[in-house]
Amino acid sequence: MAYLTQQQLEQLHFKYLGKNVKISDKASIYNAKNIHLDDNCRIDDFCILSAGVGGIYIGKYVHIAAYSSLIGAESIILADFSGISSRVSIYSSSDDYSGEFMPHPTIPDEFRNVDNRPVYLDKHTIVGAGAIVLPGAKLNIGVAIGALSLVLGKEYPEFMIYAGTPAKAIKERKRNLLELERIMK
């Protein structure tokens, strides 16, 4: 995988650009002025980051694996030590599919009903391959989401493992990673 050079990263004019940021030269970045990238984060091949007015915040030591997307008008926050596996889609905006309104961004706003809500992944959260995270989702510290799960726009209590469509609590997650973080610092 080839990464953008420091000069190429700086030319994108991110809201904030930390140290040791690695972005694949095959990733697509839209509205970089609304994207905060902290130290030691990595964005792999074919990822899409499309920041709306709410922006995208990527914390320290965050990994976004290949083919993942972060898209929407509201904020999307991935706190320190969080990560998303391949083909994860995170949306802070979603059209109304009921038929009462018209979907799609090509339609004038007065004919649409868009669910715009922030998405928050707290420290030490991980989202498995192929999962979908919808507007309003709040994954508290230490949450793990299984592969191919559907994460609804609600709060998920800390240090639990969730899986399924929709994602449901499976079992508690160990907290040893907090001690490892302390040792690392």
Residue ranges and their predicted role:
Residues 1-32, 37:
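N-terminal segments that cap or nucleate solenoid repeat domains
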Residues 88, 95-96, 149-150, 156-157:
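Flexible glycine-rich beta->alpha loop in the catalytic core of nucleotide-sugar glycosyltransferases
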Residues 5, 27-37, 42-133, 165-166, ...:
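Flexible, glycine/small-residue-enriched loop-and-beta-strand segment within the central core
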Residues 158-160, 165-181:
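Conserved beta-strand-loop-alpha-helix hinge in the C-terminal portion
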Residues 130-143, 149-153:
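Beta-rich strand-turn-strand
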Residues 22, 83, 126, 144-145, ...:
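Short-chain dehydrogenase/reductase
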